[in-house]
């Protein structure tokens, strides 16, 4: 298992600065955020460390060589939109960019794209499963033809009132995953234990059942404020009663989680996803949070 970093937390860094910092900190890999250049639609989105819309083969070779010179692997090309958005233009733009990422990932020899499945928040799960098959069948045909794995993060994307009532990502439960995996052998999970923890689910059980579909891993923690949960209730906006935290500062049992990853012989990349407002006051705060997270997770990975 290789410990890495999700690049979204360092939006002001160039690709070179990002890879240099990752190497200095002791990371073995980085998930590179590849959003289209433009205004961010939410926190930690809209980050572009590789602009695939302005990249030729020479530029691809440059990125690969620079990463190699740093001794840091590019674990995947990451982009987390809603390709099943109820607005057709928004959905189509997301789908098209995912396909571009698949093509770039194949050409660069990365063969991994990390993203969201998407969801129409106003439709039922069953209706969304039908929509998923319609939208994702052609996308996965491209991925299969190019030998690229697509790792879907298991985040419900249901935190605030603008994501109400159903959330913006369908792929948050085993019930959905079983049907999702029927579509393609190249479709798997970018598994983050903080999401099932938030949903009150067992965080390690899915690793054993879906061991062959754990393509990529995120390390992120969650802190639940019980007083606020008592006030608002479980069916309120989750942002009212929980906070994303650095690994080790919330409720996720990372010793047990990494132990389960070892049990299933997971040998891929596991990237720390730093999302913690307590460590975002300045770039020094951000770096401190990253480095603390690296030290904390290294004790479990033997780095």
Describe each PLM feature range.
Residues 17, 61-73, 83-191, 198-199, ...:
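Active-site acidic/histidine proton-transfer and metal-coordination neighborhood
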Residues 28-34, 73-78, 111-115:
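Short, well-structured secondary-structure segments
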Residues 2-5, 47-49, 85-87, 123-125, ...:
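A short, structure-level motif marking secondary-structure boundaries and short turns
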Residues 11, 56, 94, 132, ...:
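Charged, low-complexity surface patches
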Residues 37-38, 81-82, 120-121, 158, ...:
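Positions that flank functional sites
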Residues 1-29, 34-36, 68, 109, ...:
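Histidine-acidic metal/acid-base catalytic patches
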Residues 33-62, 123:
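Glycine-rich, proline-tolerant flexible connector loops at the mouths of alpha/beta enzymes
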